[in-house]
Design a protein with these regions (language model features):
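Bacterial Sec-dependent N-terminal signal peptides
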Residues: 2, 15-33
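Bacterial N-terminal signal peptides
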Residues: 7-17
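N-terminal substrate-binding region of glycoside hydrolase catalytic domains
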Residues: 30-109, 115-144, 150, 166
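Acidic (Asp/Glu)-rich catalytic clusters
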Residues: 32-35, 65-74, 98-109, 153-160, ...
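Hydrophobic faces of well-ordered beta-strands that scaffold small-molecule active sites
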Residues: 38-43, 78-80, 110-114, 163-167, ...
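Active-site beta-loop-alpha junctions enriched in small/polar residues
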Residues: 43-46, 83-85, 115-119, 167-172, ...
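Aromatic-rich peripheral "rim/lid" segments of glycoside hydrolase catalytic domains that contact
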Residues: 51-55, 263-269, 281-297, 301-342
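Active-site cleft segment of glycoside hydrolase catalytic domains centered on the general acid/base Glu
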Residues: 92-97, 101, 122-228, 232-236, ...
Length: 342
């Protein structure tokens, strides 16, 4: 995710210079979403933002619990990241569990996003937790298993069973570098995925394990990764994707993403999901058009499970992130209305 903080400024520049913006969503027939379609939001910044004094407001301007605002916008699922030992403490296991309890109490389904790092893990950076840095690979696999079990049990102790669990975040080139760098040693990465998969299932056989890559439009990347995992004996239940277009590109990227989703289902017989999406908060109408389209496209896939917006609550230039879906006053933009579809 860290790369998106830097990229969000560039995104806005590109959008301002685009002469081919399209903010109109295609018309869709009145077809309901499939049963249990996940309309989700990653709100991992929630507790940190609240602690900083920021408040969230509904469209009437009344201060409200963020989760209630999202629920009223049609969100039914919450995604939460967890880091191993972050310096700040935010997004550690304890903080994640607190948010999960709040979400579960309000009836949300839960996705757990395990980064296997003390900091952001994304396509550019997959740094081992400091405490794991010197471990030989055999020990590292055991540590991944034990840590995953501990996080799952922390939720289980609160009566929470996550419906989905990501084993790694945006692992385009594997995780826990250098040992698990897929372009160098796909077998090692597959074994790390398998350690996480086995750990999740040892605590909850019903939780679906996700392997998550960015650039959901890039079929070449996805075939390379999942062919490699399959050839090396790794198991997974769901293929997760990220998609962050701009106003000038969302229609073409949505089409490519749909093609990729259908190919993943046909090629691997696995479910697919958009685990992260976002567009600049400054372009709410374009964002609503994009979200409406990608929700309906995902719904059209035979094994399409849902769409999650990444940190929609980010506003007031929170940590420099500009791809949220709340305005400068802390209210949801019209982009979030896309999730009201039933």
């Amino acid at each position: 995710m860290r790369t998106k903080f830097i990229g969000s400024v560039l995104v806005c520049v590109l959008m301002l210079n685009s002469c081919t913006r399209d903010i109109s969503a295609p018309e869709y027939p009145d077809v309901p979403l499939t049963a249990n379609f996940a309309k989700g939001a990653d709100v991992s910044w929630m507790t940190e933002m609240e602690a900083s004094g920021l408040k969230f407001y509904n469209n009437s301007g009344t201060a409200q619990d963020l989760l209630q605002i999202l629920k009223d916008k049609g969100i039914n699922s919450i995604r939460l990241r967890t880091w191993v030992n972050p310096v700040s403490g935010w997004s550690n296991t304890e903080d994640m569990v607190k948010k999960a309890v709040r979400a579960k109490t309000m009836g949300f389904r839960i996705m757990l996003d395990i980064h296997y790092s003390d900091v952001w893990a994304d396509p550019a950076v997959q740094t081992k937790p400091a405490a794991w840095a010197a471990q030989p690979f055999v020990t590292l696999k055991t540590t991944v298993f034990n840590y995953t079990v501990s996080v799952m049990n922390a939720l289980k102790d609160k009566g929470i069973t996550p419906e989905w669990v990501q084993v790694g975040n945006e692992t385009n080139d594997g995780m826990l570098w250098p040992d698990g760098k897929a372009s160098v040693n796909m077998k090692n990465y597959a074994e790390l995925v398998q350690s996480g998969y086995t750990a999740v299932k040892s605590v909850s056989t019903t939780s679906k394990v996700i392997v998550h890559l960015s650039n959901g439009y890039d079929n070449t990347l996805f075939r390379w990764m999942f062919d490699g995992l399959k050839a090396n004996g790794a198991n997974w239940d769901v293929i997760g994707m990220s998609l962050y277009p701009v106003a000038a590109t969302w229609q073409s990227l949505d089409k490519q993403c749909l093609s990729n989703m259908n190919d993943m289902v046909a090629r691997y017989d696995k479910e697919v999901m958009l685990c992260e999406v976002g567009m600049p908060a400054a372009e709410p109408e374009a964002s609503r058009a994009f979200l409406t389209d990608i929700i309906m496209k995902t719904n059209s896939v035979s094994k399409g499970l849902g769409v999650f917006y990444w940190e929609p609550e980010a506003y007031n230039d929170w940590q420099g992130y500009k791809l949220g879906a709340f305005d400068v006053t802390g209210k949801p933009t019209v982009a979030m209305d896309a999730f009201l579809v039933k």
